[in-house]
Amino acid sequence: MLRLLQIEYIKLWNNRASKFLIISYFVLLSLIALISMIKINFGAINFSLAEQGFFNFPYIWHLNTYLAAWFKLFLAIVIVSMMSNEYSNKTLKQNLIDGLSKKEFILSKFYTVLSFSIASTIFIFLVSLILGLIYSDYTQPSIIFSNLDFLFAYFLKLVGFFSFCLFLGVLVKRSAFALGFLILWQIFEGIYFLIFFYKISPAFYEITSKFLPLNSMSNLIKEPWSRLSAIKTAANQIGANANFDYHTHWYEYVIVMAWITIFICGSYVILKKRDL
């Protein structure tokens, strides 16, 4: 495993674009901390995100994993480019000539996906922990380390999304077309929502949409805003229901794990049958 990872990181670190995107990704993740500095002073209105409970434990685990997931496209570009470069630079063929099997080749890419996901999860854990210890009103260990399941959901969401990008990179060969296909698939799931939710049956959509790849990954971390006490108070005043189930159910984990298996095995099958 370490040998395969070393091969991939040598390739990535010698690619200036990949290096820039990886560094930019972690810089953007660290900028989440700057949210704590946002203060609005407008006449008699004094508003601070930190004072509104944004960084209270255990809510911060939910909020930061939700926000950080939006930046995953940076690493997605790296992963798609990583695969397309293997074809354009003919390093894939050279690796196979040098004795690397096709199975080991796909595993090296999957290990890279796992390492990116693990590093990102650890980074978000540390950033959230520091922000929480500084701003949270609750510092009891039992509260601090509750709701850590959001970190696992975040990790699995990244692995699923990056595995999808890897599959598209193997399938399409060109990074621009692979990213274009990713955007088209997102549009398809949006159209699926509009047709089935509004035109056919909301109940049918709720059942079937759980199995769509991007939607299933999105379901791992629901929106966190309605958990804020200010939002709940406002909702109760207008008679709206603000009590939602924010946690991930076991079957939602299983669905994403199934897609990860499909994407990685599919990548291997395509590579095995393709004439290089």
Indicate residue ranges for each PLM-predicted region.
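Aromatic- and glycine-rich beta-strand/loop motifs that create alpha-glucan
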Residues: M1-F26
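Residues that define the loop-to-transmembrane-helix transition and helix capping
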Residues: R16-K19, K103, A176
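Junction motif at the cytosolic side of a transmembrane helix
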Residues: V254-L276
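Hydrophobic transmembrane alpha-helices of multi-pass small-molecule transporters
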Residues: A33, S117, G190-I191, I264
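Secretory targeting signals
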Residues: S24-M82, L107-K173, F197-I200, L212, ...
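Transmembrane helix boundary and interhelical loop/hinge segments in multi-pass membrane proteins
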Residues: I77-K103, F110
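Central hydrophobic cores of alpha-helical transmembrane segments
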Residues: L21-F26, A178-E189, E206-F211
